[in-house]
Amino acid sequence: MMPTVYNNNVLIVQARGYVVLVTEMIHNARIVPMDGRPHDPGPSMYGDPRGHWEADTLVVESVGFDGRLPFRGSGRSLHLTERFTRTSDDTLEYRFTVEDATVWSRPWTVRIDMGRSAGLMYEFACHEGNDRSVSGILGGARYEERNR
């Protein structure tokens, strides 16, 4: 969940036995079992997450990445540990630690403070040529307005 230029919102939903992490960019939803079950043996694109609580911190550990989405050069050996801690009413501290001995000599950690968003999360949608279609879309809307 590295920040990008836009679409950085994250929705965190807690349900019985699960936490769901929904990112606005690409609109990916990661369903995190919280019941202590073992990791699934097969690899998957986003890895296999498992979560637990350490005091007031949500900890999500993901393994079993299939290598289709390499993170900074990592591959199938990637072990990702994410920590979510509420530090104030409007701030969530997000820390992630990346381990992959085939790429790095030691694990490394990043800390990002996430602020509460008062706005809505929008569907991530794009299409080819959208920079050229805006004038046509607006022109069509103005035509309809004039001819009502």
Model-inferred region functions:
Residues 1-148:
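PEST-like low-complexity, intrinsically disordered acidic/proline/serine-rich tracts
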